[in-house]
Amino acid sequence: MNWMQATLLFRPKLLDCLHGYNRERFSQDVGAGITVGVVALPLAMAFAVASGLKPEAGLFTAIIAGFLISALGGSRVQIGGPAGAFIVIVYGIVERYGLANLILATAMSGVLLFLMGLFRLGTLIRFIPVAVVIGFTNGIAVLIMLSQIKDLLGLQVAAMPADFFGILNTLWLNLHTVNLAALLLSLASLSLVVGWLRLSRRAQGTRYRWASMVPGSIIALVFATLVTWLLNLPVETIGSKFGGIPSSLPGFSWPEFSWDSARFLLMPTLTLTLLGAIESLLCARIADGMIGDRHNPNQELMAQGVANFVTPFFGGMPATGTIARTVTNIKSGGTTPISGMVHALTLLAVVLVAAPLA
C-alpha cells in the first residue's frame, strides 16, 4: 500500500455530510452540540478524577479528542471523549507506572488503532464473542463501583489501590472515617438520578418530553452543588481538592518517561487499544440503528487513533466513542459531525470563560 492508496482510504464522514448541507441543519447541529457540551462537562471531569487524574485531563480530552474524532471519524453523530470503561485501566497504569507512562501507553494505543483502521481490521471487531465483551465490561463495572465507594462514603483515603482485593481491604480499614454529610448527599443524588430516569420515561410523548433529553446525572449535579453551597457542607469540591480548573489549554508537553517501566506497558497498551476499538464501534453501531445510517468502522478507528496519539501530549487521557453523549446528540437533533465539533468548542468556551469560577 503506497501513500496515495492510504490517502484514498482516509475519508472522514464529514466530507460526505457536507453535500446538501444547509442553514437549518447547521442550526440543529449547533443546538445539539451545545446540549452535548453541557452534558459532557461534568462527565469528562468525573471520569478523569475517578481515573486518578486531575479534572482538567478529562476536559482537555473531551475538547481535543472530541473535536478530532468528530472531524475525522467514520460516523455522522458519534461523540468522542473520556469514557467510564477506561477508568480501571487508566487508574492501574497511573498507580503502577506513573503519569508519564500513561501518556506513552495512550499514544502507542493511538498508533495501533490507526493501523487497525488503515489495514481494514475494523470489520473484524464484530466477530469478537458477545460473552467476552459482556464479561469484560461487567468486570470493569464492578471495579468502577468499588473504586467510587470511597467518595460515596466520604472516606479519608489518600490513594486507592488498583486491584480488587486491595480496594476491599482499604475500604474496610477506613470505614471509621465515614463523612455523614457526603453519604447523605450521595444517597440523595443517586435517588434523584433513578427518579429522574423513571420520570423521563413517563414524559416521552407528552409536553414534558424535554425531560427525557436531560440526563439525571446533570440534575443530580446541579442539586448536589446547590445544596453543598447553600448549607456550606463539609465535603470536598473540585476547587478544594484540585485547586480549580486552568483557564486555558495546555501547550505541547513531551513526558519524561522511563524505558525500564515503558517495556512493561505492552499489555496495558493492548488493553486500551482493544477496549477503545470495541467501545467506539459498538457505540457507532447503536447510533446507526437510531438514525438509519451506516458508519465506516475503519475510518472511525483511524480517527480514534489520531485522537489518542495527539491528546495525551496536551494533558489528556485515553478517548473513545461514548454511548451516553452520542445518544444525547441524536435526541437533541444532531445530524452530522458538526454537532460533535460544536460540542468540543462549547467545552473550550467553558474552559476559557468559566474555569476561574470553579
Language model features: what each stretch is:
Residues 1-358:
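Transmembrane helical cores of multi-pass ion-transport proteins
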